[in-house]
């Protein structure tokens, strides 16, 4: 299955839609952030007491990021002309976020920081994806 195949994300993220119109774009953002945020929160509960200060701070910042709409991303998304290559890029980034969130689920405290940095980078890449 290609990285830009939405079936992978749909199989893991309930109600993952597409990027066809403004409403579906906002909904897709919400359900994806919710999915990632739930996995991050589970990690906080599971290994939070074992985290160093830097990792704990990064985790808290990402959980907060997942709770609220990224206004820069939504503004870009609302005004972007989403042709098929751009949608494929968004789906590939969404898949990366799903894969990373699933890895967080089983990560121990010492492995968590690198995963959190990768999630932060993936969220940044959503702001201006490059065509696949």
Can you name each region flagged by the protein language model?
Residues 1-48:
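Leu/Val/Ala/Ile-rich N-terminal alpha-helices, chiefly Sec-type signal peptides and the beginnings
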Residues 45-129:
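Charged linear interaction tracts used for macromolecular binding and regulation
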């Amino acid at each position: 299955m290609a990285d830009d195949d939405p079936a992978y994300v749909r199989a893991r993220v309930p109600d993952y839609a597409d990027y066809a119109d403004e409403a579906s774009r906002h909904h897709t953002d919400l359900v994806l952030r919710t999915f990632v945020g739930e996995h991050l929160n589970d990690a906080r509960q599971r290994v939070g007491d074992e985290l160093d200060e830097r990792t704990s701070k990064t985790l808290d910042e990402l959980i907060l990021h997942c709770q609220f709409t990224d206004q820069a991303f939504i503004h870009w998304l609302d005004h972007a002309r989403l042709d098929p290559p751009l949608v494929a890029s968004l789906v590939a980034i969404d898949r990366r976020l799903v894969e990373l969130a699933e890895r967080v689920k089983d990560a121990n405290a010492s492995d968590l920081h690198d995963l959190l940095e990768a999630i932060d980078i993936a969220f940044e890449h959503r702001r201006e994806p490059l065509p696949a």
